[in-house]
Design a protein with these regions (language model features):
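Active-site-proximal loop/helix of nucleotide/amide-processing enzymes and allied scaffolds
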Residues: 205
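Hydrophobic side chains in beta-strands
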Residues: 85, 148, 192, 211-213
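Short acidic (Asp/Glu) patches
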Residues: 128-130, 193-196
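Conserved His + Asp/Glu catalytic blocks
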Residues: 169, 187-190, 196-202, 213-236
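Short C-terminal domain-edge/linker segments immediately following a structured domain
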Residues: 112-118, 179, 191-193, 221-224
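Helical scaffold of the NTase/Pol beta-like nucleotidyltransferase catalytic core
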Residues: 131-133, 163-190
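Active-site microenvironments that recognize anionic phosphate/pyrophosphate groups
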Residues: 1-160, 164-167
Length: 236
């Protein structure tokens, strides 16, 4: 800040600046996609391993902040429960909050999930994304994007989002999309938030799912009781 490189010496302005520097070292979006597709032809896991490492090495996923998160498991009557406290999202300082209030509202990108975030320089009320890359996917015959969450709630926490800025909607097609994804990446799980406020996801304005390479305690819980539904006896 003393040299005039930063408007203020705060985490918001430091993030904008170091992301701008990282942009000089990043492979172009098309190069990342090409490398991913080459590795995917050998193994889907090799492709995601490469992409996840790139997302960390580029500082898009800030490992030094993720390390501050607190995670533990506790036993319960229904099995173990995973608990995590996310401490890696940077707190905005008062000067950045004041600047954001005075800043002209651009409306671009429309939200934090839109594909237009790739390469975006950012502003005080929107993170810089010059170090951000996405992988295009075809899901349910429509264009979607695959990326990692910069805050990583669990291992290889990924986000799969519609290329169109459409609102969240749980319907029959939702399950088709989920199954299409795990056919592409059988080593991952994927799920959907509810399309309702409060109990749903934090960005209901943009259709998306969340997945990753992690086994939750719920997946390891023993069966309490089994039953069948008439007409669907083959479903377990």
């Amino acid at each position: 800040a003393k040299r005039g490189l930063l408007e203020h010496n705060s985490v918001v302005y430091r993030d904008l600046f170091d992301t701008k520097l990282m942009d000089c070292l990043m492979p172009r979006p098309g190069e990342v996609v090409k490398k991913f597709e080459e590795l995917y032809a050998k193994s889907p896991q090799e492709a995601t391993d490469y992409f996840y490492k790139l997302s960390q090495d580029s500082n898009y996923i800030r490992r030094y902040r993720i390390a501050k998160d607190i995670r533990w498991s506790v036993p319960s009557a229904y099995g173990d429960i995973d608990i995590s406290i996310n401490l890696s999202k940077p707190e905005k300082d008062p000067k950045a909050i004041a600047a954001a209030k005075l800043a002209k509202q651009s409306g671009y990108p429309k939200c934090l999930l839109c594909k237009e975030n790739v390469g975006y320089a950012g502003r005080v009320n929107h993170p810089a994304r010059q170090n951000h890359r996405i992988i295009p996917l075809t899901i349910n015959q429509t264009e979607w994007g695959f990326q990692y969450s910069p805050y990583v709630y669990y291992n290889e926490h990924c986000i799969v989002f519609n290329f169109q800025h459409n609102p969240m909607k749980i319907e029959r097609a939702t399950f088709v999309k989920l199954f299409d994804f795990i056919k592409l990446f059988p080593h991952y799980f994927i799920g959907s938030n509810a399309d309702l406020p409060i109990v749903g996801g934090s960005i209901l304005s943009h259709d998306h799912f969340q997945g990753g390479h992690y086994t939750f305690a719920m997946a390891k819980a023993p069966v309490i009781r089994s039953f069948s539904v008439k007409g669907y006896e083959d479903v377990t």
